[in-house]
């Protein structure tokens, strides 16, 4: 690696990196007290949050949102999100209010802004005024172009970019109050907002630059120089037998951070340098020249990027030694080790660092009540009190932009949780525009002339996925499981949840809200109660979660459980309270798995018909309800109830009637 070349030198460069995924620091450190971090925004109380939320999104007047008005407005909000309409600030309501979302108000279905504004032309122009330092300009340009294409694919609308002058849709990034009277709120919370079609600010779309903008799966790092210039880092990558999940300076003596652009660097040798102000700057007037440290600004010497002289919080530097004389500057790019928020102006993590007398080698949640991962930006937080949040998965600029551009076309928020125009952000890996979105936009502009039309009569064909309705449709669920005391019903990318069978479950909700890494459709699911972990099966792989956190190393192949290679999918699985063993069903066979020994029991597989009384082959799901003494086997729209001790079948019933409260 010493042979890798780099432009210039980086004196005093901090070599520690903030590892993506942010594992806890020293496991041996005792629990730390919760402290107040300087520069941190104190979380709102539930009541403060509710008043602000209902005022912003449901029109409850902030100065007169008293208990009676609050209760009535709260029921409207709960109805919109499919929550129990209690009028109380219960846990599910507060959880919904705290989720990241669009800053526009909520209106049911695919309704439009007041007076249903729309563009009176099909040729729409847009202009990107500013960029986020989180992504390189090419990635931002591509994300916005793909977001517009979401709508042009299903309408006659056509979008073209201009680089000067006034466009129909002006796109920019900003922080807090950014000039339109609708301030953002720092990291998380409000992600973006857009104005309805019209003159002036009509159609304009703004994105909160206190968020970490990615493509939804962690920082997107495009390398410079090396032998893979312009390609993207591949995380994790393998170097000297070790996996790296972020840029590293390992193997170098100059402190420059690098990454491999393929998984196996030792095999492929493809690498580049990660963005850093010593390599290049963005914007400004220096044509991408790197920072020059130290540089002078208003008589003061700076040895790192600064926000001094700016009101927008963006980090910049001089590209000559004297800015006062030369007036040459550029904005500092975000690196794979930059922090977010806090009080360090995006400075990188420094490892190890000392916090309350303990040493941490990586990001930690110590000292915080919200579980957010953070790091110090000096070697000793106790002395310097400088810190920031560690990078997480971030928010998909493409998905958020596609949503906001829907507003810019005239669409309001949808009550359909499967719609792009639903107000709450949920990352979707293989995005498809829903039928609700298509119906809404085509009500305004009509269908795309490029789509084939049927001259005959009959219903309009469904173009996008439709959110299922459990009581009006005969749904065959992909999986059913009791997880942390709640019963979850899975169908495609949706779930419904309830505590008591027979009560109408809450939902539909998106699976990705709870388990974001899962594919759009699962085959089976069960909870391993001994460890309180949820296990999901899809195709020839399985996933293991602790709460909503995917265990390291997953997904894994079914063969690692001890299933034979010819088993390419699982029908159902459950942990039986009678013997604490897990049963896995596929076709007409089943296997028994020992959760303690982590291996299959000998003597399996066996035929279902030989061991289970009246249980059919090719099951859909199995659940052993905690404390009930019964297990339930689901197939199609019916279930069979089995008495655990005697193995007698005691009931056959309708899922819709007995489980869904229809």
Swiss-Prot record:
Primary localisation category: secreted
Cofactor: Ca(2+); Zn(2+)
Gene3D superfamilies on file: Collagenase (Catalytic Domain), Fibronectin, type II, collagen-binding, Hemopexin-like domain
Residues that, per the record, bind Ca(2+) 3: 185-186, 208, 211
Glycosylation sites: 575, 644
PTM (free text): Phosphorylation on multiple sites modulates enzymatic activity. Phosphorylated by PKC in vitro.
GO BP of this protein: angiogenesis; cellular response to UV-A; collagen catabolic process; extracellular matrix organization; proteolysis; response to hypoxia; tissue remodeling
Name the UniProt record assigns to this protein: 72 kDa type IV collagenase
Species in which this protein is naturally found: Oryctolagus cuniculus
């Amino acid at each position: 690696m010493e042979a890798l070349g780099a432009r210039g030198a980086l004196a005093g460069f901090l070599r520690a990196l903030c590892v993506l995924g942010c594992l806890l620091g020293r496991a041996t450190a005792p629990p730390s007290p919760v402290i107040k971090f300087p520069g941190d925004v104190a979380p709102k109380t539930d009541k403060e949050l509710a008043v602000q939320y209902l005022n912003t999104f449901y029109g409850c007047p902030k100065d007169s949102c008293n208990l009676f008005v609050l209760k009535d407005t709260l029921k409207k909000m709960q109805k919109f999100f499919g929550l129990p309409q209690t009028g109380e600030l219960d846990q599910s309501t507060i959880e919904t209010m705290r989720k990241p979302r669009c800053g526009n108000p909520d209106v049911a279905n695919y309704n439009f802004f007041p007076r249903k504004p729309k563009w009176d032309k099909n040729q729409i122009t847009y202009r990107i005024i500013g960029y986020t330092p989180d992504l390189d300009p090419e990635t931002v340009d591509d994300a916005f172009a793909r977001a517009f294409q979401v709508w042009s694919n299903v309408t006659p609308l056509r979008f073209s970019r201009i680089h000067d002058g006034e466009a129909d849709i002006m796109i920019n990034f900003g922080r807090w109050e950014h000039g339109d009277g609708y301030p953002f709120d720092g990291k998380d919370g409000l992600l973006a907002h857009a104005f309805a079609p019209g003159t002036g600010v009509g159609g304009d779309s703004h994105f909160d630059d206190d968020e970490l903008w990615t493509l939804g799966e962690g920082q997107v790092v495009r390398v410079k120089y090396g032998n893979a210039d312009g390609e993207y880092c591949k995380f994790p990558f393998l170097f000297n037998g070790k996996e790296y999940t972020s840029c590293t300076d390992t193997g170098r003596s100059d402190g420059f951070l690098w990454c491999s652009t393929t998984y196996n660097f030792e095999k492929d040798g493809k690498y580049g340098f990660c963005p850093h102000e010593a390599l290049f700057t963005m914007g400004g007037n220096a044509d991408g020249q790197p920072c020059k440290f130290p540089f002078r600004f208003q008589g003061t010497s700076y040895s790192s990027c600064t926000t001094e002289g700016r009101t927008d919080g963006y980090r910049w530097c001089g590209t000559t030694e004297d800015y006062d004389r030369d007036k040459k500057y550029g904005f500092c790019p975000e690196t794979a080790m930059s922090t977010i928020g806090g009080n360090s102006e995006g400075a990188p993590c420094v490892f190890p660092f000392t916090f309350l007398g303990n040493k941490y080698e990586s990001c930690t949640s110590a000292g915080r009540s919200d579980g957010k991962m953070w790091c110090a930006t000096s070697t000793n937080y106790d002395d310097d009190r400088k810190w920031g949040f560690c990078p997480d998965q971030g928010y998909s600029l493409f998905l958020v932009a596609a949503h906001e551009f829907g507003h810019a076309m005239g669409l309001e928020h949808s009550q359909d949780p499967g719609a792009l125009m639903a107000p709450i952000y949920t990352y979707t890996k293989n995005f498809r525009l829903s039928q609700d979105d298509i119906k809404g936009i085509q009500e305004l502009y009509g269908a795309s002339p490029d789509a084939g039309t049927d001259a005959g009569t009959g219903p309009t064909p469904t173009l996008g996925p439709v959110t299922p309705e459990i009581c009006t449709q005969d749904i065959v669920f992909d999986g059913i499981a009791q997880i942390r005391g709640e019963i979850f019903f899975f169908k495609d990318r949706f779930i419904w949840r309830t505590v008591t069978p027979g009560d109408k479950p809450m939902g539909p909700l998106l699976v990705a809200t709870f388990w974001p890494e899962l594919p759009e459709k699962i085959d089976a699911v069960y909870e391993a109660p001994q460890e309180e972990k949820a296990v999901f099966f899809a195709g020839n792989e399985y996933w293991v979660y602790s709460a909503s956190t995917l265990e390291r190393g997953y997904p894994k192949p079914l063969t690692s459980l001890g299933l034979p290679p010819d088993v390419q999918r699982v029908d159902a699985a459950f942990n039986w309270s009678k013997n604490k063993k897990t049963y896995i069903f596929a076709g007409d066979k089943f296997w028994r798995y020992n959760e303690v020994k982590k291996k299959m029991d000998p003597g399996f597989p066996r035929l279902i018909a030989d061991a289970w009384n009246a249980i059919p082959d090719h099951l859909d799901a199995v659940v052993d309800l905690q404390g009930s003494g019964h297990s339930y086997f689901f197939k199609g729209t019916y279930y069979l109830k089995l008495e655990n001790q005697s193995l007698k079948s005691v009931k056959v019933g309708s899922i819709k009637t007995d489980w869904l409260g229809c």
